[in-house]
A protein has these predicted regions:
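Amphipathic alpha-helical assembly/interaction segments
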Residues: 2-85
């Protein structure tokens, strides 16, 4: 779970530092994918009793919110054709 969460922020940072639209989009999409991976790992952790129901709900909501924000960022970049930070 830690690796997936770290991958989200690392890919956002790397995408932010890229100049080309395609590179930015690629890293933001990778970050979003890591968010979905984290959601799966949270479910497995709950199912194997490594997380309580309360912890699962809180962490899943944070992950969903982050994933939605990333989706909006990607949509905005595509819609506006932004190529700079």
């Amino acid at each position: 779970m830690e690796r997936s969460a770290l991958s989200i922020t690392s890919n956002i940072a790397e995408g932010f530092g890229r100049q080309s639209f395609q590179d930015k989009k690629h890293f933001y999409i990778m970050a979003r994918g890591s968010g979905y991976e984290l959601q799966n790992q949270l479910l497995v952790a709950k199912d194997t009793s490594r997380l309580t129901d309360v912890e699962y709900k809180e962490l899943t909501q944070l992950s969903l919110d982050s994933t939605r924000l990333l989706h909006g960022l990607i949509r905005s970049l595509v819609k506006n054709g932004q190529t700079n930070s």
